[in-house]
UniProtKB/Swiss-Prot annotation:
It catalyses: DNA(n) + a 2'-deoxyribonucleoside 5'-triphosphate = DNA(n+1) + diphosphate. The keyword Transferase applies. This is DNA polymerase III subunit alpha. GO terms for cellular component: cytoplasm. It comes from Staphylococcus aureus (strain MRSA252). It comes from the Bacteria. Pfam families: DNA_pol3_alpha (PF07733), DNA_pol3_finger (PF17657), HHH_6 (PF14579), PHP (PF02811), tRNA_anti-codon (PF01336). GO terms for biological process: DNA replication.
Length: 1065
């Protein structure tokens, strides 16, 4: 059967719908022996194509389609690699095209790379002869079977394949419409482009010279390039004085070990072992390269994380400064990182502060050269939800229908159209009419195809040779990328290092910088005490908002129950709070508070599991158990752990026998051996790498330390990192206020784009003000730095240029209080805007003329705006309230009524709100209902009042008052809302609460003596309410007696308490 020399796969993005696996499947079914991948200008699909062909006994041929030009005419051309030299030429040619965004390839460029290639010109017409003649002397130049005759050049049959069968031609039209953002023509019958995979029968019916088919086979036989995997492509580290990398590495390690105050003999023994493993595997250059770039970061003001993943288990990494985790102190295993019995590339991922990560990448590019460093390509795919909308759009579906499609496909990771089709509503939509069925048919054909490229978030490839020698390159948004994915590039043998940006490191660095600048305190995070009781008190209270790894509601709950006392408790929590091990959290907490409940299957488990109270949490513990009981080396134990996590039945059974045999030889009874194996098998699936847990727990602890000791700086930087999120900002500001931190309005003489900490509190960011853009803030801050603080509002107006000084800007700054420090009311400053915008006062930047021509008294003093209006403007311009909102102020005074905020209310609990908006609508049945916006002084929430409730409370809604509402929370369009069942004025609710309270709970007994005569030991009548005291120190409630609600002193008793110290239930 003839070879196919012109296959366009789906990696010819939006030009082909032919998946590689389908092309190979068709080749097998049609007895095709060889396939050539020839995507246009790119080599994205090479590794997958090669692997799939080899697995199915199809000969893979590597090629590419290009368009060759002489400046006047262009000709479609297929180039194929004859051997591995040709393969490298393809890499470089594709790289040239993609790096320089070439649409056409000059014949000079093609000639540069053609020596080891076969060239096939397609559809050659008379006007193309001049281009073809340039390649007369090239022994492997051909014309396709449709081309005109050119003397001396042979013809070959070549079938352009872009889709599976003639019935799939519509996929090409659909992809073109998606690519070009046009509509799909559904009126006319779909044209068959003749670019499908021909069957044997269809080929026999072709009117083509049989010699052309034979020529295709000959060409296929000439093409023998192969992809080489697992090459040794590590770059060499340039050592001082050309010393060998092995010797240099050892000298550096021993020197560093001597500097540290450690048990030298113990650490030296571990170091010798690790060094031997690393050098035997040939990875000494790798460690020196990573150490070098981390050293650069740390000496150039770029914060680096303490470690990530299993690399923190290496003493070599610790001594080189790659990590800051002592693996011996924390009982970490080197073999979990680098296993001498399973040779794989070491994988050190590095966390840098996210705002300076690019600085380190730039250093690597400068050190190794631009063509020696690249990012890695990733592909976005036409997954179910995306393809459904894309195809709907090109078929002309209106927005309502597109939204309906989106709502019918569940938000489930990896969901397929077949899965969605099992849902009745989706199935009904598909079969609503023929158009929808056609839509679904096209969607199914396109589902899963790669749609576009993007850049891998972290991976960087480094080599001391130009990368195009080993893999093709392309141009990304921020630099070069390999055309192959991370897994494919690593499999070739290229060095990949993940440069990850971690926001929390930026926050820590910023806090340290500001504390040093403002307070003169130089905090060395490597020397802070890791047994600070204030830190553990913070964690025990669950006060972990903004703290890395510990801020979710679930983790807070665990921390409150656990009451951490040691750093190890943090390590355990971060490891346990994940799907799977979460079920062990209650056991861990119970045993942590009562160690007597810890039981071990065998006494020899105690040294391994003592720190985790008998619970297996870490992967390293599984390895230690295998070593202790079965006498496994840690390398063997790591292989066992991996086998267990993969659940391969055959491998597992083999490892079970290996383990039991090892335990028997080690003197353990077979019954206990089986029990131990089953125990570690249970936990192997979700055991967490302890090295990673320790590293990330260290970041969590550092942030907790900074939050405890420098709260103003902590909250200011957390707030700066949530600029743009009104909800998160409001929540963080509310928490900061609860911690006693004063939130200051934006100050024109103090504030910046970010939040600014100070001794007095935190100045809000000017950048949070709606209508004030970054450039305006930049101008204001630069003017302040260059010429000093602004003296007053008019000085500000004089010094800021006209292009920035708009009415919109001035109003926004005034209404959020940016000029409050000048001692004038906001209403006075609003009145003054017209004056500063008048032309005769706008004497550009000339202070002398301004002082002469401007009257000294220009303010027309006005009374301050009402509190409610100030709050309204703050909410409008900032998205939250700086001054205390009237509702929030009333909440503080009335919290004794046991009322709730929107953020912590549950179904049917009373919530104090005002109605910001009431939108009345009429239902299809002619009944009135309303959509409302609820405001609790901190945040807003949508609510709905259905007809029955609306009829009941319609009159109340017309009042501008504070209300107590209750109802049921649910989701509408993925947004939380409250279905309101009951509405009362605050006054009515308070009156009823005082009259019908069933219990009074106090947490401060200092007022009790004044009302001793009111408190009775027993309940004497129906009006007596139980009085209880809640002791927070021991978390215990005790009954003090009873108080009569009808007593004339009842209200006085209630009001004598601080509202936060009493609750009516």
């Amino acid at each position: 059967m003839v070879a196919y020399l012109n296959i366009h796969t789906a990696y010819d993005l939006l030009n082909s719908s032919l998946k590689i696996e389908d092309a190979v499947r068709l080749a097998v079914s049609e007895n095709v022996d060889a396939l050539a991948i020839t995507d246009t200008n790119v080599l994205y699909g090479f590794p997958k194509f090669y692997d799939t062909c080899i697995a199915n006994n199809i000969k893979p041929i590597f090629g590419m389609t290009i368009y060759v030009t002489n400046g006047l005419n262009n000709i479609e051309t297929v180039v194929l690699a004859k051997d591995n030299y040709g393969l490298k030429d393809l890499y470089q040619l594709s790289s040239e095209i993609k790096m320089n965004a070439l649409e056409h390839v000059s014949f000079e460029l093609l000639k540069r790379f053609s020596n080891n290639m076969i060239i096939i010109f397609k559809n050659v017409a008379d006007e193309h002869r001049d281009i073809v003649r340039v390649f007369d002397s090239h022994e492997d130049t051909y014309l396709d079977h449709r081309s005109v005759l050119v003397q001396g050049i042979k013809h070959v049959w070549i079938q352009d394949v872009c889709y599976q069968t003639r019935h799939d031609a519509d996929t090409i039209s659909a992809l073109a419409a998606i690519r070009d953002n046009t509509k799909l023509d559904l009126i006319h019958d779909q044209e068959d482009f003749g670019a499908h995979f021909l069957t044997e029968n269809e080929i026999h019916q072709l009117d083509v010279n049989p010699e052309y088919f034979t020529q295709a086979d000959r060409i296929a036989q000439k093409c023998n390039a192969e992809l080489k995997y697992h090459q040794s492509l590590l770059p060499q580290y340039q050592t001082p004085n050309d010393e060998s990398a092995k010797k240099y590495l050892w000298r550096v390690l021993v020197t560093q070990l001597k500097k540290l105050e450690l048990n030298y003999d113990v650490y030296l023994e571990r170091l010798k072992y690790e060094y031997k493993v690393i050098t035997n595997m040939g990875f000494e250059d790798y460690f020196l390269i990573v150490s070098d770039l981390i050293h650069y970061a740390k000496t150039n003001d770029v914060m680096v994380g303490p470690g990530r993943g299993s690399s923190a288990g290496s003493l070599v990494s610790y001594l080189l400064g790659i990590t800051t985790i002592d693996p011996i102190k924390f009982n970490l295993l080197f073999e979990r990182f680098l296993n001498p019995e399973r040779v794989t590339m070491p994988d050190i991922d590095i966390d840098f502060e996210d705002t300076r990560r690019e600085k380190v990448i730039q250093y690597v590019q400068e050190k190794y050269g631009e063509l020696h460093v690249s990012g890695i390509v990733t592909f976005g795919h036409l997954l179910a939800r995306a393809v459904a909308r894309d195809v709907g759009r090109i078929m002309g579906f209106d927005e309502v229908t597109l939204n309906e499609i989106s709502s019918l496909i569940p938000h489930k990771l990896g969901i397929t159209l077949d899965e969605a089709y099992q849902i009745d509503d989706f199935k009904k939509f598909v079969h609503r009419n023929h158009r929808h069925e056609r839509w679904f048919s096209i969607c199914k054909k396109l589902e899963g195809l790669p749609r576009h490229t993007s850049t891998h978030a972290a991976g960087i490839i480094i080599n001391d040779h130009p990368l195009y020698e080993y893999a093709p390159l392309t141009k990304g948004d921020t630099g070069l990328l390999t055309q192959w994915t991370m897994t494919e590039a690593e499999r070739i043998g290229l060095l990949k290092i993940d440069f990850l940006g971690l926001r929390n490191l930026s926050i820590i660095h910023q806090i340290l910088t500001q504390v040093k600048k403002d307070l003169g305190i130089n905090i060395d995070i490597e020397k802070i005490p890791f047994d600070d009781q204030k830190v553990f008190e913070l964690l025990s209270q669950g006060d972990t908002t903004g703290i890395f790894q510990l801020e979710s509601d679930g983790v807070r709950s665990v921390l409150k129950k656990l009451k951490p006392e040691h750093f190890e408790d943090i390590v355990a929590v971060t490891s346990l709070y994940r799907p799977g091990p979460m079920e062990e959290i209650p056991t861990y907490i119970t045993r942590r508070h009562d160690p007597s409940k810890v039981q071990y299957l065998h006494p020899h488990l105690e040294p391994i599991l003592k720190n985790t109270y008998g619970v297996i949490i870490y992967q390293e513990q599984i390895m230690q158990i295998a070593s202790t009981f079965a006498n496994f080396s840690y390398g063997e134990a790591d292989i066992l752990r991996r086998a267990m996590s993969k659940k391969n039945r055959a491998v597992l059974e083999s490892e079970r026998q290996h383990f039991i045999e090892g335990t028997k030889q080690n003197g353990y009874h077979e019954d206990i051996s089986k029990q131990i194996f089953d125990l570690i098998l249970k936990f192997a699936d979700y055991g967490f790498p302890r090295a990673h847990a320790v590293s990330y727990s260290k970041i969590a602890y550092i942030m907790s330390f900074l939050k405890v000791h420098y709260p103003n700086y902590f909250y200011a930087n957390i707030l700066s990192n949530v600029i743009g999120s009104e909800k998160k900002t409001a929540q963080m500001i509310e928490e900061a206020k609860k911690q006693g931190i004063t939130i200051l309005p934006p100050n024109i003489n103090e504030s910046h784009w970010f939040y600014k900490p100070s001794q007095e509190g935190i100045y809000l960011s000017i950048g949070t003000i709606k209508g004030v853009g970054y450039q305006s803030v930049k101008v204001i801050v630069e003017e302040r730095y260059q010429n000093g603080k602004f003296k007053d509002f008019f000085d500000f107006a004089r010094r800021i240029p006209k292009r920035v000084k708009t009415r919109k800007l001035l109003e926004a700054l005034i209404l959020v209080g940016a000029f409050d420090a000048f001692g004038k009311t906001r209403s006075t400053l609003l009145q003054a805007i017209d004056q500063v915008l008048d032309g005769d006062l706008n004497i550009e930047q000339d202070g002398f003329l301004f002082d002469i021509l401007t009257p000294k008294q220009m303010y027309e003093d006005k009374e301050e705006l009402p509190d409610a209006l100030i709050s309204q403007y703050e909410k409008e311009y900032l998205g939250f309230y700086v001054s205390q909102h009237p509702v929030d102020k009333k909440f503080v005074a009335k919290q004794y009524l046991t009322i709730f905020k929107l953020s912590n209310a549950q179904n049917n609990k009373p919530i104090l709100v005002q109605f910001d908006k009431v939108k009345q609508i009429r239902t299809k049945n002619g009944q009135n209902m309303a959509f409302v916006t609820l405001n609790d002084g901190i945040e807003t929430l949508d609510g709905v009042i259905f007809p029955n409730q609306f009829k009941k409370y319609e009159e109340l809604l017309s009042h501008n008052d504070l209300f107590i509402v209750s109802g049921k929370f649910d989701l509408r369009k993925q947004q939380r809302q409250l279905i309101i069942n009951e509405i009362q004025t605050l006054a009515t609710f308070e009156e009823q609460k005082l009259a019908f309270a069933k219990q009074i709970i106090i947490r401060n007994k200092s007022q009790i003596d004044m009302f001793e005569e009111m408190i009775k030991a027993t309940k004497e009548n129906a009006n007596d309410v139980v009085l209880s005291f809640y002791d927070e120190t021991i978390k215990q409630m005790t009954t003090l007696g009873y108080i009569n609600q009808k007593d004339s002193m009842f209200n006085n008793f209630i009001q004598s308490f601080n509202p936060s110290d009493i609750r009516l239930i």
